[in-house]
Amino acid sequence: MQLNVNGAQAIEVSERTFGGEFNETLVHQAVVAYMAGGRQGSKAQKTRSEVSGGGKKPWRQKGTGRARAGTIRSPIWRGGGTTFAAKPRSHEQKLNKKMYRAALRSILAELVRLDRLVVVADFAVDAPKTKGLVAKLDTLGLKDVLIVTDGVDENLYLAARNLAHVDVRDVQGSDPVSLIAYDKVLVTVSAVKKFEELLG
């Protein structure tokens, strides 16, 4: 299949990488797994045995007329422990590499179908200046965009750092969430080749 390149000749690309069917279930699974992996999972609360104090029985077992109590740190008391206390845990979800790559291929194919993938021959800025990048994006009519290059471009990264709706990634740093989060995805021809190499 062919991909149109902005201001240049169309390029031949792999049907497997850019022309497959959209698998919504798989993409959803990849997005959930990616976002779950980013969770810190360090929250912690104290159970009745962990709250300080409460060693002595508040009053004797029988004869007071009050409900029996063994500790002032019971979950039903003010200042007591939490009944089912949250503990630190990993939220990581297992996703095979094969499934992850298939999800990325599915997203790329859908971006092509929805005309959200903009391919350019090359994209760079001379200096790490936001103004220069904004002017360059304006000529392409792009506002909310993810820029994907084949390698890390420091000037481009620094120029985009202060723009709320612009992000810069290299191919290996692209993930399911960032690829679907923006209105448009701007990729260079060399990045397209790198995607084919990694996902082909």
From Swiss-Prot:
This is Large ribosomal subunit protein uL4. Belongs to the universal ribosomal protein uL4 family. GO terms for cellular component: ribonucleoprotein complex; ribosome. One of its GO terms (molecular function) is structural constituent of ribosome. One of the primary rRNA binding proteins, this protein initially binds near the 5'-end of the 23S rRNA. It is important during the early stages of 50S assembly. It makes multiple contacts with different domains of the 23S rRNA in the assembled 50S subunit and ribosome. Keywords: Ribonucleoprotein, Ribosomal protein, RNA-binding, rRNA-binding. Coiled coil: none annotated. Pfam families: Ribosomal_L4. Residues 38-67 are annotated as: Disordered. The keyword Secreted does not apply. Part of the 50S ribosomal subunit. GO terms for biological process: translation.
